[in-house]
C-alpha cells in the first residue's frame, strides 16, 4: 500500500448526502476478483446516460454533462468533498478501490458509514471528518474558485485552504501510523514474519503429525 504523508490536490465537490456504495460502484461491476479496473465505472449511473456493463468501452458511452466529475474544471481532482453519511449501504471494498483508481486519495465529509470508513483506511484512502460548518464553507469556496486546491498534512492532521486557514481533523493513532507507513493488513502481518516462522517451526517440532511434507 502506498504511504500517505502530505498531499496538495484539486477538489471536486459532490454535493449529495447519503451516497451509498452502490452509487459509488454499481453492483454489476463487482464480478471481478481483481482490485483494479473499477475506476472507469466510479459513480457510473451518474457519469453516464446509459446503463453500464462490465468490460464495456466507456469512451463510446453518452456522458451526463450535468454530473460534477464530467465538468472540465474538475478533471484531475484528487480530493473529493462530500456530504454526511458518505459510503452508506452494503459493504464492498470495491468502493474505495474505485475511488482510488479514479484518482482520489482523500475524501472530506462531515460523516461516513462505519464499514466504508474502515475499508478506506485499509486500502490507503484517507477519509477526513470535518464539521458541517467547515464542509459547507469548503463547498462555497470550491464552487466560487475554479482550480481550488487543498493541502493535506496527515502527520500534522491539518487541511489548509488556499486562503491560509488551517482546519484540524482527528484520526485514530493506529490508522494514522498505517497510512504514514503504507501498511495494509498484509504489510502489518509481514512485520511479524520472523515471529510467525519461529512459531511454525516450534509447532512443527512439537506436533509433527499435523503436517504433511
UniProtKB/Swiss-Prot annotation:
Could you name the Gene Ontology cellular component terms for this entry?
A: 3-isopropylmalate dehydratase complex
Q: What SUPFAM superfamilies is this protein classified in?
A: LeuD/IlvD-like
Tell me the GO BP annotations in alphabetical order. L-leucine biosynthetic process
Which InterPro entries does the record match to this protein?
Answer: 3-IsopropMal_deHydase_ssu, Aconitase/3IPM_dehydase_swvl, AconitaseA/IPMdHydase_ssu_swvl, IPMI_Swivel, LeuD
The terms under GO molecular function for this entry are: 3-isopropylmalate dehydratase activity
Q: Supply the alphabetized keyword list.
A: Amino-acid biosynthesis, Branched-chain amino acid biosynthesis, Leucine biosynthesis, Lyase
What family is this protein classified in? Belongs to the LeuD family. LeuD type 1 subfamily.
Protein name (Swiss-Prot/TrEMBL):
3-isopropylmalate dehydratase small subunit
What gene makes this protein? leuD
Amino acid at each position: 500500500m502506498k504511504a500517505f504523508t502530505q498531499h496538495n490536490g484539486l477538489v471536486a465537490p459532490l454535493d449529495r448526502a447519503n451516497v451509498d456504495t452502490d452509487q459509488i460502484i454499481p453492483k454489476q461491476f463487482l464480478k471481478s476478483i481483481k482490485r483494479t479496473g473499477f475506476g472507469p465505472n466510479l459513480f457510473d449511473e451518474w457519469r453516464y446516460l446509459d446503463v453500464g456493463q462490465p468490460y464495456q468501452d466507456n469512451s463510446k458511452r453518452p456522458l451526463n454533462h450535468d454530473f460534477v466529475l464530467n465538468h472540465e474544471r474538475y478533471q484531475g481532482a484528487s480530493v473529493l468533498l462530500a456530504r454526511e453519511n458518505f459510503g452508506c449501504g452494503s459493504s464492498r471494498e470495491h468502493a474505495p478501490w474505485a475511488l482510488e483508481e479514479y484518482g482520489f486519495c482523500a475524501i472530506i465529509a462531515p460523516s461516513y458509514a462505519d464499514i466504508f470508513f474502515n475499508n478506506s483506511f485499509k486500502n490507503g484512502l484517507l477519509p477526513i471528518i470535518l464539521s458541517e460548518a467547515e464542509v459547507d464553507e469548503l463547498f462555497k469556496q470550491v464552487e466560487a474558485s475554479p482550480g481550488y486546491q487543498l493541502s493535506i498534512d496527515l502527520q500534522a492532521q491539518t487541511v489548509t485552504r488556499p486562503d491560509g486557514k488551517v482546519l484540524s481533523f482527528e484520526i485514530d493513532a493506529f490508522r494514522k501510523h498505517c497510512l504514514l507507513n503504507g501498511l495494509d493488513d498484509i504489510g502489518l502481518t509481514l512485520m511479524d514474519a520472523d515471529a510467525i516462522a519461529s512459531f511454525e517451526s516450534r509447532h512443527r517440532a512439537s506436533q509433527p503429525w499435523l503436517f504433511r511434507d
